[in-house]
């Protein structure tokens, strides 16, 4: 039997099996490497003025694909060209590309686990999404190059070789896989993904499943053991988690003021979440039941929980899009709430922080509010400052809808910054009004030298919540508004937490880097 195989396939038929095992071993040690990184590196921010070493450490800590992908690819490609001459055994290396793409699949699937039970103590699954995206693209490109090179090799062979090779059912399976792979590349382009995320997500899932099983049929020698079995085990776990950790629930209430703001408050029953969960965790919501096919094909939607475990309801604060196709939670419709996922805030912050500043924009209040309450009520710290940036005063009133904040008093440490005037008739439009008009509108109010309310005008659409100050017509000045925040002796236990658009987060990161303090963030749209 063995002599027949050698005659049919040649002595290089099994040449790539050791290389596939090598890639699998590298994947295992890379996961160990990820775990060790969060133990030895601190969540210190690095900015423009930081050293190269600090910027590299930050990229390593944040699992930035710019750093992590080259590390991984260099490790797996080091022994790629080995033993066989490429001029005499070109097909060995073409096959090796195919085995490389499939051998990387287990790692890529593990990076996409939700929640990631392998790295749960150190990472949230959102930390690993950028690397998962870029590794997916690399796998697809490697697989496509593998296929193209074989087609070229056959086309350059003897007459009729190409047709004969494609007629082989194993080879035909690989050729047919081109269509979903090319579609995946096309729909993963930013504009196409934004145009129809549902289409991208469906193609992403179907292509992934097809790749796992079609390549298992296509590959020779077989990749069933161990690769296919590992991939199936991971898929089964993902399916189990998405089914078992989901609860079907209705919406208790939806508080809106569409005439003045797109911020809405949605309340879910307390039973939608387990007895204990961490502040600023998030859930994913699907409009479909677990038995509906679209529950598995279409994406679920993430929402940050604005409540604490002691609350009687689960509050969500959402910035609703005006786009007719955007997902909206509506009264009277049942939804599936999938799991609760850990927040972007490290456990070390929740357990060891002594000085905390929270800066959030717009619907990022759903991230900041539970953390603010946590550091005031559950884990009191010696210094807490909460800053909320909003487009207009009407957005502040969303706090009046929250029964969960109870008697919370922000009169000493909670500050609002309103970037538009309450008198501006276009305050709900996307274009920012002229700053001079904003400043003129403040002349009827009593303000301090920083532009903060010290008394409110009758009829002003501000919240009943007790703020220390409400600042009109200006954004945060990090150095001034947080002038009492940083104590040099306590920087190891000092945390700046930000949530909002990327510009706000990058400004916060720069401030944290300049002051050598810890930093954590979550990106929202303001």
Curated annotation (Swiss-Prot):
Q: What is its EC number?
A: 1.16.1.-
The alphabetized UniProt keywords are:
Electron transport, FAD, Flavoprotein, Ion transport, Membrane, NADP, Oxidoreductase, Transmembrane, Transmembrane helix, Transport
Q: What is this protein called?
A: Probable metalloreductase AIM14
Where does the sequence pass through the membrane?
A: 17-37, 60-80, 96-113, 138-158, 172-192, 199-219, 221-241
Q: List the subcellular locations.
A: Membrane
Top EC category = oxidoreductase
* Function field: Probable cell surface metalloreductase. May be involved in iron or copper homeostasis.
How is this protein positioned relative to the membrane? Multi-pass membrane protein
Entry similarity comment: Belongs to the ferric reductase (FRE) family. AIM14 subfamily.
Q: Could you name the Gene Ontology cellular component terms for this entry? A: plasma membrane
Gene3D superfamilies under this entry? Nucleotide-binding domain of ferredoxin-NADP reductase (FNR) module (3.40.50.80)
Q: List, alphabetically, the CDD domains matched.
A: NOX_Duox_like_FAD_NADP (cd06186)
The chain positions of domain FAD-binding FR-type read 238-370
Q: Where is the Ferric oxidoreductase domain?
A: 97-214
Q: Which Pfam families match?
A: FAD_binding_8, Ferric_reduct, NAD_binding_6
Source organism (scientific name):
Zygosaccharomyces rouxii (strain ATCC 2623 / CBS 732 / NBRC 1130 / NCYC 568 / NRRL Y-229)
**Domain of life the protein comes from:** Eukaryota
Biological process, per Gene Ontology: reductive iron assimilation
Name of the gene this protein is made from: AIM14
Task: Please give the InterPro entries that the UniProt record associates with this protein.
Answer: FAD-bd_8, Fe3_Rdtase_TM_dom, Fe_red_NAD-bd_6, FNR_nucleotide-bd, RBOH/FRE
**Key word Signal present:** no
